[in-house]
Amino acid sequence: MIHIITGSTLGGAEYVGDHLSDLLQEQGFDTKIHNQPNMSEIPAKGTWLIITSTHGAGEYPDNIQPFIQALQNTPPNTSALRYAVVAIGDSSYDTFCAAGKHAYQLLGDIGAKPLANCFTIDVQEHPVPEDAAEAWLKRVINRF
């Protein structure tokens, strides 16, 4: 099972999550999307695909903040967890993709195994982030 965990303010990360979920299902993977992620509802094993934008001064969107805080405050045993992170941002800000980069580092710090490097999508270059995310998934799908 691939748990797709989104952090979104305006819906862009949710759209990317929906699109990647469809593509993964077409390849035979089981997926579950968590647009309001809750640590108690997502097992710390299998695969997590975190897709998040960055809000304000490098912060997480409101919907994913409690999930990230739970990971930081009471990290679960992640020895059986693999993860990938897609970070969506705007390179005209100095906090470009800060939330996604932090999530990637946090998961590694608490013992989860990365499937790929943190993938950043610059909306200045990719106004439709689903397209960039799809190209990335095609490159790394064999790692899932």
From Swiss-Prot:
Q: Which cysteines are joined by disulfide bonds?
A: none
- The residue ranges of the Flavodoxin-like domain are 2-141
> Which UniProt keywords are given for this protein, alphabetically ordered?
Electron transport, Flavoprotein, FMN, Transport
Please provide, alphabetically and separated by semicolons, the GO molecular function terms listed in this UniProt record: FMN binding
InterPro entries per UniProt: Flavodoxin/NO_synth, Flavoprotein-like_sf
Look up the record and name the cofactor or cofactors this protein needs: FMN
Q: Give the family this protein belongs to, as stated in its UniProt record.
A: Belongs to the flavodoxin family. MioC subfamily.
Summarizing the function annotation, the protein's role is: Probable electron transporter required for biotin synthase activity.
User: By its UniProt entry, which PANTHER family does this protein fall under?
Assistant: NADPH OXIDOREDUCTASE A, NITRIC OXIDE SYNTHASE-RELATED
Q: What is this protein called?
A: Protein MioC homolog
